[in-house]
Amino acid sequence: MRHQIQHLLAPLPGTARQIDSFHFGPEGGGKIYIQASLHADELPGMLLAWHLKQRLGELEKQDRLRSEIVLVPVANPIGLAQVLMDVPLGRYELESGHNFNRYFADLGEEVGNRVEERLNDDPRHNLRLIRDTLRVALAQQIASTQLQSQRLTLQLLACDADIVLDLHCDYEAVAHLYTTPEAWAQIEPLARYIGAEASLLASDSGGQSF
């Protein structure tokens, strides 16, 4: 297991927050990215991530992982610290009022313009080119707030993954998942495995969510 720490922009002197990511399995093959509790008051995702971390460590020791798996158990340390009179307030940032799962950097058009003249008939070349270009474009973004630095950190960790899982929960709901129509063929087996009673497909859910 490889433990990486990404420091966030500090909003005030004497304060510091970070994103911890745990990397399992071989690099250079496929990549799966899993994060939990982007809405920091949705705690079951963190519990699941803790158990998953133990299990992935066991599988790595047994050399049974075929792809890299990146696990971020606490995707929102900012929201996790927002507690008022023992009530967690981790869905919206108190300073800006922004939903923590909104306003991620939308660089699709910019990346498209950068790669347009360099695409060819090789899908692997195109995939590698688009991911590399996206990574560079994200790294060139300059965060001016801690929330912006948190968003960019998460996007940089996930931008080159083959599969991205963002774990949420609700106070009262059946098991369900969101994905895109393009990814449905890959995600449908997972939906069946977790017993999802509803699967919502949309190319763009709006709000620049993760």
Language-model features: where?
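Structured catalytic-domain cores with a bias toward divalent-metal coordination
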Residues: 1-210
